[in-house]
Every structure is written in C-alpha cells, then in structure tokens.
C-alpha cells in the first residue's frame, strides 16, 4: 500500500477593480511557512471593506484589489491495484493581500469584488467535481496538478471576461446581470 501526501498548493489571484489580474504562485514550502490570515468562502458571509487590510501604493490607479486562492491537499492510497484519493479543496480570501481606496469605493465596487471571490468558489467546485470524476493512474500527483492548472487557466479567463463585460463594475446593468447569474450558479451547485 503506497501513500502519497500533498499538503497545500495555492495560487493567489489578485483582482483589481479597474485593473487586470496578477498571479502569485507559491511553492509548497512557502505555503507551509505562511501563517497568513484567510477568510474561507461561505454563502453566509459576504466581504466587507474592513476585510481589505492590505496597503496600496500611492501610484496605484485601481480602486481595489481582491486576492483569492484555491488550495488543495490530498492523500492517495493504492490498495489492490486501485487508487483511493482523499482530497480537500478550499477557496479563500487573503485580507493582507487585498486592499481598497475608500475615496474611490462604494457598495457597487464591493459587490464587484465579492463576485470575484464567488467566481473563485465556483471554480473550486469545478475542481472538486473533475477530481471526483477522474480515473487516476500511478501518476496521481501530476494528474491532480494538471487538473488544478487547467482550472486556474479557466478561472483566469472567466475573471477577465467578468471584468471586461462589467467594465470593472462601471457598467451597472452588466454588473447586476453578473451578480444574478453567479448567485444562481452558486445556489444550483452547492
């Protein structure tokens, strides 16, 4: 019986209102050494401006930045030639990497930032579903990582589409349409 343990791997997405996403990939060692505050995604808890604790540069032109991450941990066991996988997938908000400029922000921008977090949660759910449906071989670590990378690519494309179609929250009609669409998806796929 072989056992493979992978602790955590996270990719942060920093989404700026009125800006483009930036990525910061952390190695497992960096992730393990971090003791950073996070807020797990929950349908019962919405972001508040007080959650945005990071500092912005005076030269920064964006109104706000939301840093979210999808992380995973898994254990793989092979018994009688079959792979058994226990996996945990989390979607989290990183307060110290997220910031806002009070003079530029309002409830519409906060709603826009919340939706970035909600979109990340939808992709965490897609990741869980693909893992549950996948038939793993002896290359579990690489297969999980490949699925993870594909989900992150899809997330990046989706986040960019969201910002483009809402014009970074400036198109209120589109923002409201997106709010409704994502809320429906979250309700259907818990």
Model feature map: region roles:
Residues 29, 33-84, 93, 136-190:
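Metalloprotease/metallohydrolase-associated module, dominated by Zn2+-dependent proteases
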Residues 104-107, 132-133:
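Acidic/histidine-rich, surface-exposed loop or edge segments in extracytoplasmic proteins
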Residues 81-105:
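Active-site scaffold of zinc-dependent metalloenzymes
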Residues 122-131:
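Membrane-interfacial alpha-helical segments at the cytosolic side of multi-pass membrane proteins
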Residues 110-119:
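Active-site His/Glu-centered metal-binding helix of metallohydrolases
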Residues 117, 130, 158:
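Short alpha-helical functional segments enriched in proximate histidine and acidic residues
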Residues 1-28:
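Bacterial Sec-dependent N-terminal signal peptides
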């Amino acid at each position: 019986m072989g056992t493979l343990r992978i602790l955590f791997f996270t990719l942060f997405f920093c989404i700026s209102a009125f800006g483009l996403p930036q990525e910061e990939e952390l190695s497992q060692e960096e992730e393990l050494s971090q003791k950073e505050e996070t807020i797990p995604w929950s349908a019962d808890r919405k972001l508040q401006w007080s959650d945005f604790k990071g500092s912005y540069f005076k030269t920064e032109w964006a109104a706000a930045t939301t840093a979210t991450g999808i992380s995973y941990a898994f254990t793989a066991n092979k018994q009688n030639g079959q792979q058994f996988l226990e996996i945990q997938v989390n979607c989290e908000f990183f307060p110290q990497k997220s910031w806002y400029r009070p003079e530029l922000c309002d409830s519409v921008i906060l709603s826009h930032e919340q939706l970035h977090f909600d979109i990340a949660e939808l992709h965490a759910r897609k990741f869980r579903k693909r893992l549950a449906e996948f038939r793993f071989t002896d290359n579990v670590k690489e297969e999980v990582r490949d699925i993870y990378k594909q989900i992150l690519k899809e997330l990046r494309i989706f986040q960019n589409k969201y910002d483009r179609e809402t014009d970074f929250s400036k198109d209120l009609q589109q923002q409201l349409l997106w709010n409704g669409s994502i809320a429906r998806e979250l309700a259907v796929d818990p």
